[in-house]
Amino acid sequence: MLDVNAFDKLKIGLATADDIRGWSYGEVKKPETINYRTLKPEKDGLFGEQIFGPTRDWECACGKYKRVRFKGIVCERCGVEVTRSRVRRERMGHIELAAPVTHIWFFKGVPSRLGYLLGIAPKELEKVIYFASYMVTSVDEEQRHQDLPDLQDEFDHEVQNLERRRNNEIEERAKKLEADLAELEADGEVKGSAKTKLRNGAERDMAAIRQRYDDQIKRIAAVFDKFKSLKPGDMESDVDLWREMEDRYGDYFEGCMGAEAIKKRLQDFDLEAAAKELREEIETGTGQRKARALKRLKVVNAFLTTDNKPEAMVLDVIPVIPPDLRPMVQLDGGRFATSDLNDLYRRVINRNNRLKRLIELGAPEIMLNNEKRMLQEAVDSLFDNGRRGRPVTGASNRPLKSLSDMLKGKQGRFRQNLLGKRVDYSGRSVIVVGPSLRMHQCGLPKPMALELFKPFVIKRLVDLNYAQNMKSAKRLVDRGDSEVWGVLEEVISEHPVLLNRAPTLHRLGIQAFEPILVEGKAIHLPPLACAAFNADFDGDQMAVHLPLSAEAQAEARSLMMASDNILKPADGHTVTMPSQDMILGLYYLSTVIDGAKGQGRIFSSLEEAQMALDKHEIDMQAKVLIRLPQDFVLPKDWEPGEVQVIDPEPGSPDVVKEERFADGSVLFATSLGRILFNDTLPVDYPFINEQAPKGKLSKIVDDIATRYSTQQVAATLDALKDLGFTRAPWSGVTMAFSDIVAPPDREEIIKGYEAQAAKVNNQYDLGLLTEEERRQELINLWTECTDKVAEAMRENFHDDNNVNIMVQSGARGNWMQIRQIAGMRGLVANPKGEIIPRPVKSNYREGLSVLEYFISQHGARKGLADTALRTAESGYLTRRLVDVSQEIIVREEDCGTTHGLPMTVAERDENGNLVLVKAADGGPYSRLLAQDVLDPADGKTVLYHAGDALSMDVLNDLVAHGVEQVIGRSVLTCESKRGVCAKCYGWSLATNKLVDVGEAVGIVAAQSIGEPGTQLTLRSFHSGGVASASDITQGLPRVTELFEARTPKGEAPISEFAGTIKVQDTERGREVILQPDDDSLEPITYQVTRRAPMLVKDGQHVDPGTQLVEGSVDPKKILRILGPRAAQMNIVNEVHDVYRSQGVDIHDKHIEVIVHQMLRRVTVIDSGDTDLLPGELVDRARFREQNKKTVAAGGRPAAGRPELMGITKASLATDSWLSAASFQETTRVLTEAALNEKEDDLKGLKENVIIGKLIPAGTGLARYRNATVEPDKAIRDTIYPNFGLGDGSLGGDLSDGDLGDVDFSNIDFGDLKLGDDFNPDDFLDDNDNPVDFGDEFRIDPDELK
């Protein structure tokens, strides 16, 4: 087989008949598959062993040669080569067709490539191919021109002859009439009626004679006229006329029906002349003609610039794919199940053989044509069943799967087998929580671990002499002997495994853990990893994968460990957060209760306080004063305060004060719980002396993540988790029915609002309010009522109420849910998303009435249906995003651009002070500066230089200096030829360091946008009747609309030019008229609805691109009026707004990566002196390069306009045909690629996955492939703590004397596996001679004695 690393490009083209014969190992002549008695393949049939190879390894068909020693021999009896049976997966055969057939992809595809090339309408082409029309293939112009005068004379002569004969016959008939009349008169009967009858009969006969001869003359005139103007490519569907022409003038032209005619035309087709003619037509033509000429020129050009031959679109030979790819298997009842392809091939072979026989018998043309048409149809259905006419069906009327269907869709070859392979060394099981596991550990069930690590265990058993060979070791493992488990423990230690939970929506869906063996059959997952996987323990399952090679293990350990993946790549916030019980425990510890037992007592040390707690002298939540040492880190901005003493001793003060002593120690007021809580945080972290609900905890963890190494953050999180779980039961928080307290004045509040509602209804009845106004009034009333009840309810909850603690701490639930249980349910929406003006006054604690239940359920069920739809919709969006951006990889450190985007860092608050912008962490944060930032105070001092990173600290500093805007580098302004550069991308949000070269930022971006897609609503809930909100698409459909660059629903117009606005109302609505400043331009009228809120006033002056009314703007128009940068920024901001409105944080840089791909192409308007074609879509980089070359050679560059493409279109327009074909419209993409002989240079990820190469991203890049793995300092310090050696550096001032008293001879180094990595070849040079290490490594033989 071909080695995937042996090539770096993949080209697709049209195969000629010789190519197909070259691939083939023999011709398939019979339609038979296997013999039903012997179950052996039939000779020369579709499964023949002579063609495709033996069905059994190293055995020929007749059994003469068996065993591997006859390898390569071809049996003289049965003609089968002795080889492995797997060649039946790769050897092809072929069928020699008795008549040529066209390839349906090139004839029936849209547009029809054959039709474009020959300049024939597809309908006409179809008539020729399916034997309904004749086609002229060649005309002997010269001979015809020479003989035309003679032929004209001949024709005139024949016409005269016919006219003469006609006149003669008519004359004879007239004479006969006269004779008949005379006879009548002679008989004496002179009745008028008899004469009339005779005359009428004679006239009828003469008219018939005249008609007959006229038809003949007309016929030969038509034949002659047709012949005179005959040219190749002419068609004739009148069979009689064609035959007449063939009989008379057959020497001067040739023509036929079917694919044969097409083939002859293609062989004689002059591409150069056609291209020249089309170019002229493009220059002179207009409108439709020009457009068609452009399209035709593309096809003609494709053949001119490649090695493809046009006649290869017509097949004389068709390939037969290897039999193991279209297998036939025996079922239980002796019946056979077979691949549909075998039926389709069988039809082709049957019809082909019948046609051969008819040709040999010399059958008449009509029979041959019919058989040829059937053969064409059989080949069509083999290649693409159902593309033309009714599909061929199998049993139970199911259309058969053709070769095209094998490639297409989710179940096709591309997506099912090439992009979605099954993986060995993997298992799956249900997950349960492992509260005692560290963040980097997972529990693996013993049986699963044994199966996964089997090869490793077997090798180790043999190494340790528990078994003599692998076979007996395997038996030991299968029996599960006691020594096996010990070896398994040893094998799995420090061998990470990967855990994956479907759906893998972002890269945190697969992480590495160190396995710990556990009993049972469930995988144990550390609770802190749940958020990243979006896992819970209600029956979720997870898959385990085993990295095998040392490189894979190193990669898993250094890049994928769960303890290293603490930040979310979408926004840079911590994804690993304490939750639920942990929060409850930590909240309990950090709460101080006023008046708790022991408040105000003073302790001389922490130990003393702990002792008092153990003796129940003080409460854990009591505020006490403890003297703490000088290295204690006080809270930020600490000022000494005072504490009230509870039950003071007689004569002692009732207030005690905090103070700092001369020795640096400090008397500090806090609770013992808070000290325990702070013990888990890093030693030098400022003391947190306040209550820590979820929000506060989140801030603390985020802060620690920015200040400390990942290892320290992971350790802190683990400590917080342990403390939280340990202390949660201490808090005694449980939930009972009695904890849900309804507010006592609930009924009163509701009664008051009922009276107001009655008043509103009364006004409606009197006609004072419209239906819409009443509805809005009621909605406002009941919303106010619900809020009042909720407020009363919150005030009624006591601080130590269990439900209150859960909500306040952020452990579970929110006030809205509690309001529905204890307060009132309030207003609900119907399935349309409109609010029903009748409120649900009951709550769930007391139960709903029937009517209330019904109106509640309606919207609730709709919600569930919506969620299911949303998941699918969001998954499809992610798939398109990944496809469009998968080739964006950080390719270089710096592209050298000086451009960037203006970014706002500060805004004014309501008091007019400068504050950091709200979306700073999703905009300027984590980018590098493109230009120096000057101090606004003097305009000279450089605060930060170009290339500095904008961390949160830097941003705050800029705001403090009064800087409002900076120029930051962005993916949109990056000038890398392929992908993007690290400096334009900025920090990787998952590490808070500059992104590494090789990072697949495109896929990270797609996942970051797609992953929260399910959280976006499918439709906006609107409070019925508010026009502005309801007309604008929101949520997921809005994101799709933006990324697909569609014209938005409810589009808002923008001004085309600078000018003055005039607003006037008309009968139909409202008109906004723009009077341009430039008088040469006509005024423009925009029709808008009266409901749409205006953004401009009558008489206002506007700039180009100003939005006139509220609504969504069409990005294509922004591109046209304001240019590409404005269009890009519009899409980025709009997408960001949709996510922000749903409370989802995504960094703008991810959206920019996608938008960068949407504007990658340029439409050529004028090709200048380049090789580009007008109207062609080309990559911006290629466009620039072509122009550079042309200008350098002194030519005229091409002109083009940037093209905004939706993500689906952009994916299909990618340079990689493998990637495009595996996305959508597979057959169309492959047709196009084959015609243009496209080369895929395998630069993206998909194409490499498809052919089975390492992806060119991450550690797959050449620059990382030869790297050596060493632990970094932080890890080294945690593995090898300094054992008091000198100054703390490892082996600081270590001298021989320090170890003088160590007896090395008695130390057992057994477990250290010293010398495992020792390779004797390291001491040999390239020619296998010992390496000379120079003098310092020379050993004097005397020293060894």
UniProtKB/Swiss-Prot annotation:
<feature type="binding site">
    <location>
        <position position="62"/>
    </location>
    <ligand>
        <name>Zn(2+) 1</name>
    </ligand>
</feature>
<comment type="function">
    <text>DNA-dependent RNA polymerase catalyzes the transcription of DNA into RNA using the four ribonucleoside triphosphates as substrates.</text>
</comment>
<dbReference type="InterPro" id="IPR038120">
    <property type="entry name" value="Rpb1_funnel_sf"/>
</dbReference>
<keyword id="KW-0240">DNA-directed RNA polymerase</keyword>
<feature type="binding site">
    <location>
        <position position="75"/>
    </location>
    <ligand>
        <name>Zn(2+) 1</name>
    </ligand>
</feature>
<feature type="binding site">
    <location>
        <position position="984"/>
    </location>
    <ligand>
        <name>Zn(2+) 2</name>
    </ligand>
</feature>
<feature type="binding site">
    <location>
        <position position="78"/>
    </location>
    <ligand>
        <name>Zn(2+) 1</name>
    </ligand>
</feature>
<dbReference type="InterPro" id="IPR007080">
    <property type="entry name" value="RNA_pol_Rpb1_1"/>
</dbReference>
<dbReference type="InterPro" id="IPR000722">
    <property type="entry name" value="RNA_pol_asu"/>
</dbReference>
<dbReference type="GO" id="GO:0006351">
    <property type="term" value="P:DNA-templated transcription"/>
</dbReference>
<dbReference type="Pfam" id="PF00623">
    <property type="entry name" value="RNA_pol_Rpb1_2"/>
</dbReference>
<feature type="binding site">
    <location>
        <position position="60"/>
    </location>
    <ligand>
        <name>Zn(2+) 1</name>
    </ligand>
</feature>
<comment type="similarity">
    <text>Belongs to the RNA polymerase beta' chain family.</text>
</comment>
<dbReference type="Pfam" id="PF04998">
    <property type="entry name" value="RNA_pol_Rpb1_5"/>
</dbReference>
<dbReference type="InterPro" id="IPR007081">
    <property type="entry name" value="RNA_pol_Rpb1_5"/>
</dbReference>
<feature type="binding site">
    <location>
        <position position="895"/>
    </location>
    <ligand>
        <name>Zn(2+) 2</name>
    </ligand>
</feature>
<feature type="binding site">
    <location>
        <position position="536"/>
    </location>
    <ligand>
        <name>Mg(2+)</name>
    </ligand>
</feature>
<dbReference type="InterPro" id="IPR012754">
    <property type="entry name" value="DNA-dir_RpoC_beta_prime_bact"/>
</dbReference>
<dbReference type="Pfam" id="PF04997">
    <property type="entry name" value="RNA_pol_Rpb1_1"/>
</dbReference>
<feature type="binding site">
    <location>
        <position position="974"/>
    </location>
    <ligand>
        <name>Zn(2+) 2</name>
    </ligand>
</feature>
<dbReference type="Pfam" id="PF04983">
    <property type="entry name" value="RNA_pol_Rpb1_3"/>
</dbReference>
<comment type="subunit">
    <text>The RNAP catalytic core consists of 2 alpha, 1 beta, 1 beta' and 1 omega subunit. When a sigma factor is associated with the core the holoenzyme is formed, which can initiate transcription.</text>
</comment>
<dbReference type="InterPro" id="IPR045867">
    <property type="entry name" value="DNA-dir_RpoC_beta_prime"/>
</dbReference>
<protein>
    <recommendedName>
        <fullName>DNA-directed RNA polymerase subunit beta'</fullName>
        <ecNumber>2.7.7.6</ecNumber>
    </recommendedName>
</protein>
<dbReference type="GO" id="GO:0003899">
    <property type="term" value="F:DNA-directed RNA polymerase activity"/>
</dbReference>
<feature type="binding site">
    <location>
        <position position="981"/>
    </location>
    <ligand>
        <name>Zn(2+) 2</name>
    </ligand>
</feature>
<dbReference type="InterPro" id="IPR044893">
    <property type="entry name" value="RNA_pol_Rpb1_clamp_domain"/>
</dbReference>
<dbReference type="InterPro" id="IPR042102">
    <property type="entry name" value="RNA_pol_Rpb1_3_sf"/>
</dbReference>
<dbReference type="GO" id="GO:0000287">
    <property type="term" value="F:magnesium ion binding"/>
</dbReference>
<feature type="binding site">
    <location>
        <position position="540"/>
    </location>
    <ligand>
        <name>Mg(2+)</name>
    </ligand>
</feature>
<keyword id="KW-0804">Transcription</keyword>
<dbReference type="InterPro" id="IPR006592">
    <property type="entry name" value="RNA_pol_N"/>
</dbReference>
<dbReference type="GO" id="GO:0000428">
    <property type="term" value="C:DNA-directed RNA polymerase complex"/>
</dbReference>
<dbReference type="InterPro" id="IPR007083">
    <property type="entry name" value="RNA_pol_Rpb1_4"/>
</dbReference>
<dbReference type="Pfam" id="PF05000">
    <property type="entry name" value="RNA_pol_Rpb1_4"/>
</dbReference>
<feature type="compositionally biased region" description="Basic and acidic residues">
    <location>
        <begin position="1335"/>
        <end position="1345"/>
    </location>
</feature>
<keyword id="KW-0479">Metal-binding</keyword>
<dbReference type="InterPro" id="IPR007066">
    <property type="entry name" value="RNA_pol_Rpb1_3"/>
</dbReference>
<dbReference type="GO" id="GO:0008270">
    <property type="term" value="F:zinc ion binding"/>
</dbReference>
<keyword id="KW-0548">Nucleotidyltransferase</keyword>
<keyword id="KW-0862">Zinc</keyword>
<feature type="region of interest" description="Disordered">
    <location>
        <begin position="1325"/>
        <end position="1345"/>
    </location>
</feature>
